[in-house]
Regions:
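Short alpha-helical elements
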Residues: 1-216
């Protein structure tokens, strides 16, 4: 369902660049791909999320248990993410992708490049200094805050704020339902804005016609 919806409305997306981020979600019960995450001091699942420049969620990786970091099985995760875009007839070749320092690894960069994607990854201090040959466009990276806003949007939906399901497919389905709601909400807002502009333009034209001076 989600891939078809994404394909149908792909013209509404802003693919000038995309953002990638990992997100841990707490689980109230046990279940598939659930594990203890020390930083959150609770059981979580971890998934990677990709958004467009507007912050609209595009796809996610198959979640893994919470004890794993964002680079766990990164080849599989990137193949899943870029594969979904390709299924939706959204070209990935030439995309610029922002990611935080947690993705600063040779494997991740190589995986992106193998799909034709340019990784704009913040340098991790533990991997050395900033005088490196890898790509990092600061001006582009500063736009990454938008995916943090998307995380806040997602958290406003109780169905994905905390995991109550025990099956992985159910949890993924809830995420894609939220993706669809956010996309359709954005489309509706855009249509309302366009209609408002057209009405304003039409009213302005009528007003101008009413006040056109007549010179006999």
């Amino acid at each position: 369902m989600w891939t078809n919806l994404l394909k149908k409305h792909r013209s509404k997306l802003d693919m000038s660049s995309v953002d990638l981020d990992g997100s841990h979600t707490r689980a109230t019960k046990g279940g598939e791909s659930i594990g203890y995450q020390g930083r959150k001091k609770s059981k979580t699942t971890n998934a990677l999320y990709l958004t467009d420049r507007q912050g609209l969620p595009l796809t996610m990786s198959v979640p893994v248990s919470g004890e794993h970091n964002d680079l766990y099985r990164i080849k599989r995760s990137t193949d899943e993410i870029f594969g979904t875009l390709e299924e939706a007839v959204i070209p990935v070749d030439g995309l610029f992708l922002n990611a935080d320092a947690g993705f600063d690894s040779e494997d991740f960069r190589n995986q992106c490049l193998s799909h034709g994607v340019f990784p704009n990854v913040c340098f991790n201090k533990r991997n050395g200094g900033y005088d490196r040959n890898e790509l990092l466009i600061d001006e582009l990276y500063r736009k990454r805050y938008i995916i943090e806003r998307t995380n806040a949007w997602m958290d406003s939906f109780r169905s994905v704020l905390v995991i109550h399901d025990t099956t992985l497919t159910s949890w993924e389905a809830w995420n894609y339902i939220v993706f669809a709601v956010l996309l359709l909400r954005n489309i509706k807002h855009s249509l309302v804005k366009i209609t408002s502009i057209k009405r304003t333009t039409k009213n302005t034209e009528l007003t101008e016609k009413q006040f056109i001076p007549y010179f006999p």
